[in-house]
Amino acid sequence: MAKRLYGLFAILFLLCGLSACSKPETALPAQTTVLILGDSLTQGVGASSAQTSYPALLKQQTQWNIINGGVSGNTSTQALARLPELLQQHQPTLVIISIGGNDFLQRLPNSDTQANIAQSIALSQQSGAQVLLVAVPELTLAAAVGHPNDHAMYADLAQIQQVHLLEDAWSDVLGDEALRADPVHANDTGYQVFTESLTKRLQQIGWLD
């Protein structure tokens, strides 16, 4: 009997390790400062107004102090360059990182993109913030007519650096013509769908009640 229980605990421990499971995080109260580092998808390109961008929608749902750090056209290099000042100015409790799409569109080396995102995670953690990494699909002209998939580097980064990951949210939105303003940007409905995926993940993690 003891051996069977030991074996069961061993299996559960292994599964936790493989899935990066951990004790649920503490819920973040209203007015918590949350920085979202990103590109045009975070800025809200394709939305009918700034109020229908996903950072604005997230603020409405959480009452957090959301800092929209999205700049259209930014690559991971450019976002990384902006990050230290953003961290110093806003001192966020949580940093959400959603970057890489422009790197893929410009065919920049994946190794550089991964290194930049890894450094963005490290800088955020060094500032005392927790991190949520958002997986981004490898956008190509071929993907625009099919269903894009998350680039594998995001799962690798989340595992290596032990941060929480939101998977498939952008891929699902950009893979549905009804949710897109154009092949690489969401429309109002798409940003709403993405926000729903994001808030669900935040609840799973424990940051949002």
Spell out what each predicted region is:
Residues 21-75, 82-91:
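Serine-esterase "nucleophile elbow" of acetyl-processing enzymes
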Residues 14-18, 24, 200:
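N-terminal processing/targeting junctions
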Residues 1-19:
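Sec-dependent bacterial lipoprotein signal peptides
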Residues 59-61, 81-209:
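Alpha-helical cap/lid subdomain in secreted, periplasmic
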Residues 17, 67, 132:
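Conserved Rossmann-like nucleotide-binding pocket used by diverse enzymes
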